[in-house]
Amino acid sequence: MKILILGSGVIGVTSAWYLVQQGHEVTVIDRQGSAAEETSAANAGQISPGYATPWGAPGIPLKAIKWMFQRHAPLAIRPDGSLFQLRWMWQMLRNCDASHYAINKSRMVRLAEYSRDCIKQLRADTGIQYEGRQRGTLQLFRTNKQFDNAVNDIAVLEQEGVPYNLLTADKLATVEPALAHAAHKLTGGLQLPNDETGDCQLFTKELVKMAEAAGVTFLFNKQVKQLLVEGHRIIGVQCEDGVMTADNYVVAMGAYSTELLKGLVKIPVYPLKGYSLTMPIVDAERAPVSTALDETYKIAITRFDNRIRVGGMAEVVGFNLNLLKARHETLKMVVQDLYPGGGDITQTHFWTGLRPMTPDGTPIVGPTEYHNLYLNTGHGTLGWTMACGSSQLLADIISGKKPAIASDDLSVFRYVNGFNTKLVPFSHQLHTELRG
């Protein structure tokens, strides 16, 4: 089949890769001049299935109020009066209870664990290089309450069969030696030894080369205007320079997917703004070994070959890409507090991007009510973690194969009866009938 993918971030490019591997004729279009130039450009770099956690969690509403008065708050909300923003925040609020949190985290971990297996296989099959490390990740706790609350996440990890190590403060340096000096500031940590790290942009650009060699066509500097519809089918994509057609269409445009699909498919995907700093390593012994995640500030510090990436935070501010000095200061403060002298803080690249976030934290992967339109979006802060698994899953669905993991509760149909997180059954048999 001829398939047109809209978007060339890590989600769009991995979608292209897995689809061409199944014999499809694939074209990818993007408004940028090359792949991975927006949300995939400078994320935190962690591939962390066990830390796949929804932002909508018990206690978040109260914490959000407290964070409003903190200088280094991990979450900032700036109301703009739009119905889009208000509706999304209300939907997220409805997920901030224990039962919804457990359902959402279980879904996310399931997909993220599968995705980690997929990237391992991809690495074995292709030898792709992206400054990746397989040294695990370490969540750091600064309070006893954070340490005690880890038991809730551990229950989900055990349910999903994810290996973990709960460490007291004096044991943290056995995993991250450079943290020896900071043990007195921390109460402990949760290590996930099977997690990975790597440069998402580098991975995506390398995979573009491999996908092109396999037959995928990439068309850049191509602005998508709208989807053309006839009945329950998409008949083309209107671009600035003409119409493109295919048998099937995949929307992988991150936070911009919502506007493109307006009036066709209603998806609750909102742009959650995040920031990162990247700096050269000046003392390897003072730098992280892999990724350390500061639970208090929701900031990840990741080691690449010769660089440190510090990323995190979330702002509910719409499509705003202004770089705020205060956020730069927060990122700098955290890395200097935990890994002083590891990187050159005077030579940093400051970046911001918009993560496509759903209120329940779970991405939207799979078919729609339009027979030949598929979605791969809404991965939030976990696009890098979930990319390969989501795209392998989507390729199997489009090809009529049974996915390796349960996928019904990942599709847009979970929102059919208004916003909720209850499973709306959508069988593969019904999907086949819709495609017919």
From Swiss-Prot:
FAD binds at residues 3-17. The keyword Oxidoreductase applies. Its cofactor is FAD. The keyword Flavoprotein applies. One of its GO terms (cellular component) is plasma membrane. GO terms for biological process: D-alanine catabolic process. Pathway: Amino-acid degradation; D-alanine degradation; NH(3) and pyruvate from D-alanine: step 1/1. It holds the Pfam family DAO. It catalyses: a D-alpha-amino acid + A + H2O = a 2-oxocarboxylate + AH2 + NH4(+). One of its GO terms (molecular function) is D-amino-acid dehydrogenase activity. Its EC number is 1.4.99.-. Disulfide bonds: none annotated. Keywords: FAD, Flavoprotein, Oxidoreductase. HAMAP family: DadA. Oxidative deamination of D-amino acids. Belongs to the DadA oxidoreductase family. This is D-amino acid dehydrogenase.
